[in-house]
């Protein structure tokens, strides 16, 4: 039977980039985007409609809704972030990067939108083979609490990957009784 301390130590070994806390779970509270702009509420409504269209794989229509949301409120970082996602799904990474850069310039530093935009931008960089830029953005998203970003950082770290592989082999041998 393992103690909570044992589990915390093992968790830190297996997940070296995960933040530690007394409970083993980091609590990060991200701020919501909120703007004092006359068109912000309408922009949010149009954005929700765009998300529904994107979920139905009606990407052209979704992009139109996100664009309308931005016409109503050009300072809405979430609309840029969501339009970037639709562009990514259409395999238009340049347009997605433009929107993600704009979302990050408008979003507060500790917002859900910033976290999502960092993950999206890092994913594009990773697909392009630009691991340094991907690592930087995944690290920013990880600091904001993204568990996906934390896993990607481990995957991008060759030493952590090697350590995880060796530990997996040790545990497998221990389960099967091998020396």
From Swiss-Prot:
Which family does this protein fall into? Belongs to the TTC36 family.
Which residues form the TPR repeats?
Answer: 43-76, 78-110, 115-148
One Pfam family, short name = TPR_11
Q: Which InterPro entries match?
A: TPR-like_helical_dom_sf, TPR_rpt, TTC36
Protein name as catalogued: Tetratricopeptide repeat protein 36
Provide the organism lineage as a comma list.
Eukaryota, Metazoa, Ecdysozoa, Nematoda, Chromadorea
Which key words tag this protein in UniProt? Repeat, TPR repeat
Record SUPFAM superfamilies: TPR-like
Q: Which GO terms describe its biological process?
A: tyrosine metabolic process
